Regions:
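Catalytic machinery of carbohydrate-active enzymes
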Residues: 1-341
Length: 341
């Protein structure tokens, strides 16, 4: 592969998926320092991507605006124009779906590659890269596409730089909530998009009480109405109320809260993966997804899998109407924490 000057990455959402793809941009810059990296992303992960110093240009793709004919006619041509302002030496479709294939189709490039498991006919546009990690962790699968265009991957680096002003605002929010600089605290990620990725609120509450007895403060994080409701349920079930930061921070401030914590605990969801990306000790509670593919990168030994024969089913909601992660008792998590030292 010749020198790369312009590379387009298509990885649209969600937060955890975008985090997993960040090392690809680092690998490109590490191998081709003068390369310009453009990334197409959807609004939910925009502020996360802005913290990536390895991305030179961000193109925003707002899928919602394309759902009506009027919206499509208004948005398509400006988006296409921005996408085609330059040609690319390579296009890497790390989403592997119809919507990302459509973006790759309109991008001007002779080399279009995708991940090993392309879906929705996206492999008709971008050639799947079936590398040595095709059965491995999703981070390594993404990196196989970088290797395919000549990138050396000497180490896996998640390039994330939190703006100083956002860290300062996060500190102020935390202090106002009762967490002073230097106070030890752990982060509970209370929700997840998939219902069966959520640990029961009574379990979080019991674990929070256990931490308080160790003089460690539990901090609840999340966003949206559902996470707010879950956090209130946890609060109501605890002996001492936790620090509740749900809906109190933006993504960049949340990143500071996570990076400064002693431990992050939650299901297979974006903020938990962010903890692993920062190298913070991370315990991931897993049911419908696979540890080897989706566990906390670099800390797979800290994942706790549910003891069910159907684990790794990849279903958003349990067809048996069972609460998947309730089979992970609080005592399992406490023992895992003790084993971490």
């Amino acid at each position: 592969m010749e020198e790369l000057n312009n590379v387009l990455i298509v990885k649209l959402s969600a937060m955890g998926d975008v985090i997993h793809a960040l090392p690809v941009s680092y690998a490109i810059k590490e191998t081709f320092p003068s390369a310009k990296v453009t990334w197409v992303v959807e609004p939910p992960s925009l502020e996360l991507l802005k913290m990536n110093p390895c991305v030179d240009r961000i193109i925003l793709f707002n899928k919602k605006n394309f759902r009506s004919l009027k919206g499509f006619m208004k948005e398509f041509f400006p988006f296409k124009h921005e996408l085609q302002e330059q040609s690319y030496d390579a296009v890497l479709d790390l989403q592997g779906l119809f919507k990302s294939a459509a973006i790759a189709f309109f991008a001007k490039s002779n080399i279009k590659l995708g991940i090993c498991n392309m879906r929705e006919m996206s492999d008709k546009i971008s050639k799947p890269v079936v590398g040595e990690n095709a059965e491995g962790h999703i981070v390594e699968r993404y990196l196989d596409t970088a290797r395919a265009v000549g990138c050396g991957v000497n180490e896996v680096v998640f390039p994330i730089q939190i703006p100083v002003e956002q860290s300062e605002k996060a500190r102020a929010i935390m202090e106002h909530a009762g967490i002073r600089e230097g106070n030890p605290y752990v982060v509970f990620v209370v929700g997840a998009n998939w219902p069966n990725k959520r640990w029961p609120t009574e379990n979080f509450a019991a674990l929070g009480d256990w931490f308080y007895h160790l003089a460690v403060v539990p901090v609840l994080i999340g966003s949206g109405d559902l996470d707010e409701m879950l956090a209130k349920e946890i609060e109501s079930k605890m002996e001492i109320p936790p620090i509740n930061l749900v809906n109190q921070t933006n993504i960049q401030q949340l990143a500071h809260v996570i990076r400064s914590s002693r431990l992050v605990i939650g299901g297979d969801t974006g903020p938990v993966h962010l903890g692993a990306a920062f190298g913070v000790r991370t315990i991931m509670l897993m049911g419908p997804t696979n540890v080897e593919r989706n566990g906390p990168f670099g800390q797979l030994q800290h994942a706790i899998e549910v003891e069910r024969p159907c684990k790794g089913c990849w279903k958003r909601a349990c067809p048996k109407k069972e609460i998947c992660l309730e089979k992970i008792p609080v005592s399992f998590v406490e023992e895992k924490i003790k084993s971490m030292g």
